[in-house]
Amino acid sequence: MPAENRFLHQQYPSDPLNDPVLRTLNVNEAAETDFSKLHTVLKIGRIQLVHGTFMGDDPFGIADTLKAVAESVPLLAGQLNRMAEALLEKTRPFTTSMTGDIGNYHEPYRKRFQELVGDDPQVELLSPTWSGQNHHLARADLAIRLFHQLLIRPLLPDQNLLLWGHSHAGNAFALLTNLLTNHKPSVAEFFDKAAQEGQTHWDDVRTHLEKSPSPHPLASRILIAAFATPVRYGWDTDGYARLVHITHHRPVDDAAPARTKPLFPPHLPGDVINARWGDWVQAFAVAGTDVSSMPTRAINQNLASLLEANLPDLEHGLDTRLIMPKRVRDTCVRWKSGTRCHSDGLNLLVDYEPSGDLSPIGRPLEQSLLGHGVATTVRWLPTHLKLVMDALML
């Protein structure tokens, strides 16, 4: 996407600016790597780990719904709000206890990351976390939270920040690049559509951007590693310093090796479970797959009028024209495109040699979560870190 992307959406199929790189990874290839270059060469002083969808403190919007009902029924407000707060407190720890490092960043992952890089940079899990809900507002809120963190905990003058995120966290990073470019009219429209007045982090970031130059000075200090991020929001090239995508991929067609096997017609179940063509979830989560919670439905419709405004009307063949409703019909056409790569940044399409390790449910790590879970595993972290460091230094 261009400079001054103005919150435009990527297209299906996408048109990568740089040629994707395909390669195979071995779990032991980073054994002798000197990771000090992250600090000495790339000047990274902080690494922020951000989990993806459904791994947050309110992934299905239950707490949000309870709070919305509480506003409408004052007599029950106290009880409902207490229930909501209890859910927010307990959901993330429960999820982490069940998933471990499969599709999720947790404390053992952070500790291993810190061991690899030494005392500098500092490696942090995002705290407080984000909801993990699967819609525009949740990802927009994450982008604002990340920006707000930089306001309340500024980087040192000579430091850069590496954002290291999984799945739709990467799409929050994309929104952040549009915010950092700070095209005043489109940023104002973004805040108006989100309608989050009264939320401290939203108010603080909006006020700050209104007073800041364009692009924001922080833009040149943001490096991004996006793992398994679905192709959604456009990246603004004035809103970051460097960007690399790491996606589990196995080519299906030698004539178009960077495309994935189209998800429509559907894959055979065994091919999905065994990640025969790589990360199925990353290819699945295109525009049209969001799920709004009850309290966010209207706001998400408003945000879609900005964030999906440039998605074209789609032409349908015999295989899709009778599918109802229109949203599903259009999503099927997008799945047919086999879109794997992002328009901007360096797309690293990686296949994994089997490590021999198994997930808690007995699946090979490389097949976990339909090929989506390997990106966050401690076992593959050294190799992933070497891959990212080398790419950022190109």
Residue ranges of each PLM-predicted region?
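N-terminal low-complexity, Ser/Thr- and acidic-residue-enriched intrinsically disordered segments
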Residues: 2-81
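Active-site catalytic motif of lipid deacylating hydrolases and related acyltransferases
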Residues: 48-159
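A composition/secondary-structure signal for short, hydrophobic, low-basic-content segments
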Residues: 47, 164-167, 368
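Serine-dependent carboxylesterase/thioesterase catalytic core
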Residues: 136-273
